[in-house]
């Protein structure tokens, strides 16, 4: 963070990006930049939109010593829960994700990079499952036969989403794809 950007008592969150999972760090950060900038045009509640802090040269992340880093403004009076303390915690996290999805209904999804190729391609995942079952490299398949049979019995349904996308019956939309409790900041006071 450049000294001209430093404000007294301004706090930050510095995150190391897992580039083993997200191999296209530039694409990931372009996605985050595009989505957060778009969200700012859709809501007056700017506290609900992450603020990415740029590097001195205007980049959205830093690559140094084989590691990738990004910085966000710290959201004051917020909490991040690993486990729910009440049913309301789950409800409010669902409200957060629902609001996120609703605000992005008209975002041009085709502009986003696929940061983990085929991660949500169910037929591709199914093929990988079959290949792994055939090899059974850890010799554990016998221990999970009911689960394997459950998946195998649903082969016909595995292509439903990909087919609907390809036919145009299902529009391409932005989704969060990691909707878990600790990916939502909750208001610490309410």
What are these regions (language model features)?
Residues 11-31, 37-111:
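ATP-binding pocket architecture of kinase catalytic cores
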Residues 179:
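Hydrophobic HxD+1 residue recognition
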Residues 1-7:
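Short, small-residue-biased leader/transition segments that mark boundaries at the very start
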Residues 15, 22-26, 75-95, 106-176, ...:
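ATP-dependent phospho-/nucleotidyl transfer catalytic cores
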Residues 1, 47, 170:
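Structured loop/turn residues at beta-strand edges in well-structured enzyme cores
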Residues 8-11, 188-190:
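Active-site beta-strand-loop-beta-strand hairpin of nuclease catalytic cores
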């Amino acid at each position: 963070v450049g000294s001209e950007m430093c404000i007294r008592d301004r706090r930050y969150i510095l995150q190391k990006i897992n580039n083993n999972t997200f191999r296209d760090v530039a694409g990931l950060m372009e996605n985050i930049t595009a989505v957060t900038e778009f969200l700012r045009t859709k809501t007056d509640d700017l506290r609900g939109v992450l603020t990415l802090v740029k590097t001195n040269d205007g980049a959205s992340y830093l690559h140094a010593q084989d590691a990738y880093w990004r910085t966000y403004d710290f959201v004051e009076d917020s909490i991040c829960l690993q486990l729910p303390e009440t049913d309301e915690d789950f409800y409010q996290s669902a409200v957060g994700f629902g609001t996120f999805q609703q605000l992005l209904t008209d975002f041009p999804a085709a502009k986003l990079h696929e940061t983990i190729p085929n991660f949500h391609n169910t037929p591709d995942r199914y093929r990988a499952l079959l290949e792994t079952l055939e090899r059974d490299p850890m010799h554990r398949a016998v221990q999970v036969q009911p689960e394997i049979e459950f998946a195998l019995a649903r082969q016909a349904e595995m292509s439903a989403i990909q087919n609907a996308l390809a036919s145009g019956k299902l529009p391409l939309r932005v989704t969060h794809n990691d909707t878990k409790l600790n990916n939502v900041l909750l208001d610490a006071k309410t």
